[in-house]
């Protein structure tokens, strides 16, 4: 039987809590478990009663204080009921024996060694005596969200070195286009290394593929010094199978989260789900989401989030009826208002962007509540650039939707949409000697579309290299596969003119 004991301090959070320079208190939310031990570098990975965790009187939270630590990194896991070994779901760094071998050590110079021979699987890491990053531009804030010009980028397909330090070197190029915000595709720990990042496993950790946490902080800090906000693409609709939230409560017979999983639905509530669907009406999930968002906004000083698949934050079951999924859902609105209110308790200026694509009556409510809403104008603008009839009003003009607030983040391209120039060159219209399939003509068509696009009031977003007429198909090398990095486009005078 576990020792029943109240938490020693009232302000402890799930995960690692540092107590001075030699101790940590570990907390794990794990209701309905019988016993949990901690194993790690600090006890040579031995299963010992000295490292049995205490259970709080409400029987929901397990905790232990580990003393006698030195100023260094320690790997550890939780051994649950003698059957499940998992990394801390709130870990800020994990070691992966299957994928870390392909992490470039020049990008992540201080990666701790995996405890080979002591354990197996993914392990979590904490570091005692870690030096705080010396922020220089903490006073930065977004002054006017409706004037955002956002540059969406995926580090893997933007720079060959795939690291934050080289990304810093591109800021003059990005800033020269009038960009005042960068939206990073997901950089939280995801499964594998080569990915868009929408397959998250540890939502509090920086994925090691692009560098360590201080390198990310330096990138954000320097962006702020240049007057550029940094927005994080946040994936909280779901988790993938390596997540400890999945593994702690798993139905092996049906290969899905168990019915008593505190965070995840056994079966997703909508047809567009990927991975395993979070139940955002669960108090466990709400607590988790609140801590994750606070971590990224305060520890890394991100300026806001673009929430992936925000329409999925509902327990309304619409499987088999995609149309019903998009209809006005007051329970979903309530979830988003709760998340917003929790953020506003400590950050009044964070920009909250929803990839929602719900019916207009719901998006109008959310816009009025201060959310920015993605507005996909790809089809309409691409029809125009190809030389066909098109109505440009709905995708990019908030007033056409009956909104009072300029909170529509419109875009002609995104990571999810086909590239304008690809379709211009493949399917462009013609009239006599005038053909949109001609490269320079196609570029001129995109230039004309841009002149219209950027004059419509409200925030705007462009996709990386779209300013140079990137013309590789979105499905080149597979939809989420690596794409050619085309800085050489700058050598083409007509492409360079477009930007």
Q: Which positions does each model-derived feature cover?
A:
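Non-catalytic, glycine-rich low-complexity segments
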Residues: 1-34, 112-115
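Aromatic-rich carbohydrate-binding modules that target alpha-glucans
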Residues: 18-20, 27-71, 81-104
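Short, solvent-exposed loop/turn segments at secondary-structure junctions
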Residues: 33, 71, 155-158, 189, ...
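Short, conserved beta-strand segments of beta-strand-rich sandwich/propeller modules, principally
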Residues: 73-75
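Aromatic- and carboxylate-lined catalytic core of secreted/periplasmic carbohydrate-active enzymes
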Residues: 78, 457, 485-499
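Substrate-binding/active-site clefts of carbohydrate-active enzymes
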Residues: 94-103, 107-119, 131-148, 154-328, ...
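Conserved alpha/beta catalytic core and glycan-binding cleft of carbohydrate-active enzymes
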Residues: 102, 301-303, 318, 323, ...
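Active-site His/acidic residue clusters
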Residues: 198-201, 475-487
């Amino acid at each position: 039987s576990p020792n029943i004991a109240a938490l020693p301090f009232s302000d402890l959070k799930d995960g690692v809590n540092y107590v001075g320079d030699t101790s940590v208190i570990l907390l794990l939310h794990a209701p309905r478990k019988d016993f949990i031990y901690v194993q790690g570098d600090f006890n040579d990975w031995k299963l010992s009663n000295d490292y049995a965790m205490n259970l709080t009187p409400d029987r929901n939270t397990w905790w232990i204080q580990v003393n006698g630590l030195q100023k260094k990194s320690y790997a550890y896991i939780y051994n649950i009921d003698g059957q499940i070994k998992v990394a801390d779901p709130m870990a800020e760094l994990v070691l992966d024996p299957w994928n870390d071998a392909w992490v470039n050590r020049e990008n992540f110079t201080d990666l701790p060694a995996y405890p080979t021979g002591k354990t197996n699987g993914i392990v979590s890491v904490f570091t005692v005596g870690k030096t705080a990053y010396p922020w220089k531009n903490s006073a930065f804030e977004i002054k006017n969200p409706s004037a955002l010009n956002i540059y969406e980028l995926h580090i893997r397909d933007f720079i060959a070195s795939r690291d934050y330090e080289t990304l810093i070197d591109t800021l003059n190029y990005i800033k020269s286009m009038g960009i005042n915000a960068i939206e990073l595709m997901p950089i939280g720990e995801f499964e594998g290394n080569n990915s868009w990042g929408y397959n998250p496993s540890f939502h509090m950790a920086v994925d090691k593929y692009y560098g360590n946490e201080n390198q990310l902080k330096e990138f954000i800090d320097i962006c702020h010094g240049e007057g550029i906000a940094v927005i994080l693409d946040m994936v909280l609709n779901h988790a993938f199978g390596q997540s400890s939230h999945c593994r702690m409560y798993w139905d092996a017979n049906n290969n899905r989260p168990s019915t008593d999983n505190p965070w995840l639905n056994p079966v997703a509530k909508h047809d567009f789900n990927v991975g395993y669907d979070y139940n955002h009406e669960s108090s466990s999930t709400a607590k988790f989401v609140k801590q994750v968002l606070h971590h990224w906004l305060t520890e890394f000083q991100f300026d806001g989030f673009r929430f992936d698949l925000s329409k999925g934050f509902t327990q309304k079951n619409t499987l088999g009826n995609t149309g019903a999924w998009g209809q006005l859902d007051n329970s979903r609105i309530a979830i988003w208002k709760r998340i917003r209110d929790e953020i506003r308790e400590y950050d009044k200026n964070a920009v909250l962007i929803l990839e929602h694509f719900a019916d207009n009556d719901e998006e109008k409510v959310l816009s009025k509540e201060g959310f920015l809403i993605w507005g996909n104008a790809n089809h309409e603008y691409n029809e125009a650039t190809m030389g066909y009839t098109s109505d440009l009003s709905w995708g990019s003009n908030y007033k056409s939707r009956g909104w009072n607030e300029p909170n529509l983040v419109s875009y002609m391209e995104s990571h999810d949409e086909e590239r304008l120039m690809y379709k211009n060159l493949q399917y462009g219209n013609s009239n006599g000697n005038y053909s949109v399939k001609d490269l320079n003509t196609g570029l001129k068509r995109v230039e004309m579309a841009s002149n219209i696009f950027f004059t419509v009031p409200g925030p705007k977003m462009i996709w990386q290299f779209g300013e140079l007429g990137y013309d590789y198909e979105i499905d080149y090398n597979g939809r989420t596969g690596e794409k050619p990095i085309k800085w050489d486009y700058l050598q083409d005078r007509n492409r360079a003119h477009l930007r």
